[in-house]
Regions:
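Amphipathic coiled-coil/heptad-repeat helices and related helical stalk/stem segments
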Residues: 105, 194, 353-354, 424
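Metal-dependent polysaccharide deacetylase catalytic core of the NodB/CE4 family, i.e.
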Residues: 157-177, 181, 221-223, 230-237, ...
Length: 496
């Protein structure tokens, strides 16, 4: 195996304590696979990030007036009425009981209804002029109204949040006895395990939602509780994935290498096989979940997918987009090795490609959160250090992924205790001033949700080797660990 960078895998043991009754206290938690990137190590002069060009085609060809038939002048109202009459007559005379337009509308409404947006489905049908004369559209709308009225409001405080790191594709490469094996075994999940987990959770009635469904920001800037309406028996949950940068140290260890858009416009992963062959497919959380929801649209609430918690020091989504790759200043050894192995590396092209993937992902229901630029521990870092770090995130990551109001703390750390954030909390006030309103730590409790007039806060549960091996009972509400455990995972899983 290749030589690894010393200290890049860092593990932090986490515990969730109950203090004063039922109040969870989050302490340092088992959340990370990458060490903090020091600010001093990667200072650079910065990089201009290309704005994505939107091209519009204007292909208006003027026809020769002599080739056009003579026009008969008709008042606008008369023309409009005539067109409406012609449309209705054409619909009435159609031999097909359901016109192609009606079929399209019914399909669109059905998709919305499958993801519990019954109001949207009804609007699609009722807002079309065909609705008044279409029995099929009226019947569908009536059915959706009945389903909407049967929905119940789910208690927000009982919504769990689960998270993963990059999935292991090839266990023989990840668990090969080198210095990284222990960290992978503790904090990673295999592709096989992930697929089994989501299938079981789907069968139990779980449905993906977003923190933005749980709490909404009002026009006056205050925050209030959202309302999640689902059929009786459905269980909303939030899913996130940390560090989807495909760090250099993971090369050759059985993980995907980047996210790409395939010929069908779908987000897939590139994966480099042991023989060097590069293949494209479902090799990590994003494409696996996308494919699953295509088959099971009712696993998603209003089109929601998951949240990617992103650092920036090695770039994003597998693209080497940090400014250091352009300026060549203060490079780490793995960055130097990458640039040496890729002498034709084009930074601007890399940034443009990453932006294209991020845009497609957001359009498809995915969201992005800051994980701090350098994977900082927000508990032990000073406010000044976090400010410096966040400036880098805003400079090198936000222009690619877009602005975000969510921060998912690295190492499962936090900037306050279980009682909540206050105005004298310098770290909180800074993040709030930069637009962050949704905050997530790591907590072993089944639920930890705080919603105030200023912020949303939620604890996350790690579904990894460590948690499955040592605390399988803590995951019983989601699945039976014995049904998902990958037998190729070495045991015992190392303690933290």
């Amino acid at each position: 195996m290749k030589k690894k960078i010393a200290g890049v895998l860092t593990t932090v043991l986490a515990a969730s304590l109950l203090v004063g009754g039922n109040h969870p206290v989050t302490v340092q938690v088992d959340n990370m696979i990458s060490g903090t990137q020091d600010d001093e190590d990667t200072q650079s002069d910065g990089a201009e990030v290309e704005a994505e060009e939107e091209q519009s085609e204007e292909a208006k060809v003027a026809a020769d007036p002599e080739d056009q038939p003579a026009a008969t002048e008709t008042p606008k109202e008369e023309k409009k009425a005539e067109k409406e009459t012609q449309k209705r007559e054409a619909a009435e005379n159609s031999s097909d009981s359901t016109s192609s337009d009606e079929k399209t509308l019914l399909r669109k409404a059905k998709k919305l209804a499958q993801q519990y947006d019954y109001t949207g489905a009804i609007s699609v049908l009722k807002n079309n002029w065909k609705f008044a004369t279409s029995d099929k559209m009226q019947e569908a709308a009536a059915a959706y109204m009945k389903k909407r009225d049967a929905c119940v409001e789910y208690p927000l405080e009982n919504i769990t949040h689960v998270f993963f790191h990059s999935l292991i594709v090839n266990t023989s490469l990840a668990f090969d006895g080198d210095s990284d094996e222990a960290g992978y075994n503790q904090m990673m999940t295999t592709v096989s395990e992930f697929k089994k987990m989501i299938q079981i959770m789907y069968d139990k009635g779980y449905v993906l939602v977003s923190p933005h469904d749980m709490a909404v920001i009002n026009d006056d800037g205050t925050m209030s509780k959202g309302k999640i309406m689902l059929p009786e028996g459905k269980i909303p949950f939030v899913l996130s994935e940390d560090d989807v940068s495909y760090y250099h140290y993971m090369d050759g260890d059985g993980f995907a290498t980047k996210l790409v858009i395939d010929d069908n416009g779908d987000i897939k992963c590139e994966y480099k096989k042991a023989d060097g062959t590069v293949v494209t497919g479902d090799y990590d959380v994003v494409p696996i979940l996308d494919s699953f929801i295509k088959e099971h649209p009712d696993f998603s609430y209003h089109g929601r997918k998951g949240i990617l918690a992103m650092t920036g020091y090695n770039g994003v989504l597998g693209y080497r987009t940090d400014g250091a790759y352009k300026t060549k200043k203060n490079l780490q050894d793995d960055q130097k090795a990458f640039l040496k192995a890729n002498p034709d590396f084009d930074y601007d092209k890399e940034v443009k490609a990453a932006k294209k993937v991020a845009k497609a992902m957001k359009k498809n229901g995915w969201e992005f959160a800051s994980h701090t630029w350098g994977h900082r521990n927000a508990t032990s870092s000073t406010a000044a250090e976090l400010k410096t770090d966040n400036k880098k995130w805003e400079k090198y990551v936000a222009p690619i992924l877009g602005k975000t109001d969510m921060i998912i703390f690295a190492f499962g750390a936090d900037i306050g205790d279980w009682e909540g954030y206050t105005s004298d909390n310098e770290k909180y006030e800074y993040y709030k001033s930069r637009g962050y309103r949704y905050f997530c730590n790591v907590d072993s409790s089944q639920y930890f949700v705080q919603i105030t007039s200023e912020y949303f806060r939620q604890g996350r549960r790690n579904l990894d080797g460590y948690r499955m091996y040592y605390n399988p009972d803590m995951l019983s509400d989601l699945f039976d660990v014995s049904e998902v455990w990958d037998s190729s995972r070495p045991t015992p899983v190392p303690e933290m």
